[in-house]
Design a protein with these regions (language model features):
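Primarily the internal scaffold of c-type cytochrome electron-transfer domains
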Residues: 1-16, 20, 24-158, 162-186
Length: 186
């Protein structure tokens, strides 16, 4: 094989490896057969990044997590340092494979908070947009049950993935289904 495919993107650019997020459970399973791959995953994005309304609990909450989850701040790397550590208001993650490499976690609550230096208006709108298209409201004042993209309805990688390159199909008409009435991917 001349070419070995590799994962590319933001996380790889930071120096992250798969094991930085996916621990033993996600890599080796729990000994039980699952009906789909996702059912064997212990961690979810909000476990480290939180939501637009709350900072992360820093414990696993995925389909394969136990009822109380695994506390991420209790995990130690081979060098003895904590894998995840709160330093003031900042959540730091240290690489499991590269000693000395660490990064600041981006927290959705800060991205959605206007007085924060991390505030991003486009991200805030995407995460908190109301389903009511007549008002086009967004922000923390929109209740979770009224949000178009609430974390109770959509997983983060619905939009945040290398294969989701545009809003076409969900929000914009596409030529692929031009014969259908809705013009959307179903």
């Amino acid at each position: 094989m001349d070419h070995i495919p590799t994962v590319d993107g933001f996380y790889v650019d930071l120096g992250m490896q798969c094991v930085d997020c996916h621990f033993a459970q996600d890599g080796h399973g729990d000994g039980f057969l699952k009906n789909e791959v996702m059912a064997a995953v212990e961690i979810q994005c909000q476990d480290c990044h939180g939501t637009a309304d709350a900072y992360p609990l820093a414990r696993t909450t995925g389909p394969a997590a136990s009822k109380i989850g695994k506390y991420l701040t209790h995990i130690r790397n081979p060098d003895g340092k904590k894998r995840f550590e709160w330093v003031g208001d900042t959540l730091i993650q240290r690489s499991a494979t590269t000693p000395g490499l660490e990064w600041k976690m981006s927290l959705l609550k800060d991205i959605s908070a206007k007085p924060s230096d991390a505030y991003n208006a486009k991200a805030d709108r995407a995460h908190t947009m109301s389903r009511d298209t007549a008002t086009l409201r967004y922000g923390a004042e929109v209740p979770l049950e009224e949000r178009a993209h609430g974390e109770d309805k959509m997983l983060c990688y619905t939009c945040h993935s290398s294969w989701t390159t545009s809003c076409g199909g969900c929000h914009l008409p596409i030529q692929a289904n031009w014969r259908t009435e809705r013009h959307k991917y179903e």
